[in-house]
């Protein structure tokens, strides 16, 4: 976000970078034009121009939900050419990230202002770099460390009992996240991952794995791609399950939010979880909003970010993660504006 973000009383030619078939692109175009602005210039991730586009400002959107682009990014990031990646498969996460960072660098080289700066998007896409930035700024986070790069090494150093989250360094929407607890006699890993034909796939439901053989199968494939090991913070529990909150921070202020509730450790709504009633949560929500604003302030060149905030049983709040593309919040209204309209108006200064 730059000083060029104030364009009152003049048309602004927006460049939308993303997967052009995605509803994110379609919906933001609609909101932008509804404010009297010209039709955005669409810029496909799979066909980035070498020369600088003739636009005033860029909105860089998610690279997800496109297998063809994923294959291209994996190759660009040092992975195999035409990787045999199926829809929903969890593989080549590191290579995908490196490839996406290479595209972001090409976009940065255009020298154009952007809603969210390319270099900050890259950091938000890296859970360890984000964690370090938060800790340096004094923003509350669960204790975390880089996980070992192999299951054997992880097994050698684990205690006799424990309760942790293992999260891929590069991922979003709960992809590859594992909630793991164990004692001397029992163990359980919960994750949206499914094992199909010797490969890992995201599913729309949280699965449970209760043998070390199953757990090893999963972690032996994820740990070498990079994971962060995070203390499991027991979430605030209500009658219908535990809750956390996704907060959309726009121009420094907490705006749209959704309280997410689940009986499993993962609260992502696409996993069959529900939006919870926020009645009686005024104090923890206010604390969550202030913490989300502190987290977003660590990325001073980004107009907006989705921030997941954990609420514990004692009223304490922690940053779960930050998402440069966490603004897809259909149906949520703040001050009579949906999320995309609020972002557009914040940039235009209206």
Positions of predicted regions on the chain:
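Nucleotide-activated donor-dependent transferases that construct or modify glycoconjugates
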Residues: 10-19
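A short beta-strand motif that forms the metal-chelation/ATP-contact edge
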Residues: 14, 57, 179, 246-249, ...
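Short, flexible loop/turn elements at secondary-structure junctions
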Residues: 18-21, 47, 170, 233, ...
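Conserved N-proximal alpha/beta basic substrate-recognition cap immediately N-terminal to
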Residues: 19-31, 35-148
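Short catalytic/ligand-binding loop motif for oxyanion handling, primarily in non-cytosolic enzymes
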Residues: 24, 123, 173-176, 329
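Phosphate-binding site of ATP-dependent enzymes
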Residues: 32, 159-268
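Rossmann-like NAD(P)H-binding beta-loop-alpha module
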Residues: 140-163
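C-terminal active-site "lid" helix and adjoining low-complexity regulatory extension at the edge
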Residues: 269-304, 311-350
């Amino acid at each position: 976000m730059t000083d060029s973000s104030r364009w009152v009383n003049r048309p602004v030619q927006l460049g939308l970078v993303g997967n052009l078939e995605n509803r994110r692109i379609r919906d933001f175009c609609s909101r932008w034009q509804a404010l009297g602005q010209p039709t955005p210039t669409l810029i496909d991730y799979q066909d980035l121009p070498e020369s600088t586009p003739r636009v005033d400002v860029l909105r860089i959107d998610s690279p997800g939900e496109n297998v063809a682009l994923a294959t291209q990014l994996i190759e660009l990031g040092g992975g195999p050419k035409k990787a045999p990646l199926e829809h929903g498969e969890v593989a080549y996460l590191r290579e995908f990230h490196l490839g996406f960072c290479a595209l972001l660098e090409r976009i940065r080289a255009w020298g154009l202002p952007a809603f969210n700066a390319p270099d900050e998007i890259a950091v938000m896409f890296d859970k360890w770099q984000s964690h370090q930035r938060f800790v340096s700024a004094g923003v509350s986070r669960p204790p975390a460390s880089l996980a070992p790069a192999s299951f054997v090494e992880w097994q050698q150093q684990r205690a006799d009992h424990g309760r942790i989250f293992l999260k891929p360094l590069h991922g979003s929407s709960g992809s590859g996240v594992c909630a793991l607890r164990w004692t001397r006699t029992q163990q359980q890993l919960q994750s949206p991952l499914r094992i199909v034909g010797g490969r890992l796939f995201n599913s729309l439901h949280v699965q449970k794995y209760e043998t070390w053989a199953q757990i090893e199968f999963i972690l032996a494939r994820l740990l070498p791609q990079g994971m962060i090991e995070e203390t499991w913070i027991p979430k605030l529990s209500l009658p219908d399950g535990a809750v956390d909150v996704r907060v959309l921070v726009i121009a420094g202020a907490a705006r749209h939010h959704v309280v997410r509730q689940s009986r499993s450790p993962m609260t992502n709504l696409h996993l069959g979880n529900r939006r919870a009633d926020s009645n009686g949560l005024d104090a923890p929500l206010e604390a969550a909003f202030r913490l989300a604003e502190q987290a977003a302030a660590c990325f001073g060149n980004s107009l907006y970010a989705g921030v997941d905030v954990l609420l514990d049983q004692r009223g304490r709040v922690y940053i779960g993660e930050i998402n440069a593309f966490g603004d897809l919040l259909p149906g949520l209204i703040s001050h009579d504006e949906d999320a995309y309209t609020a972002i557009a108006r914040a940039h235009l200064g209206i």
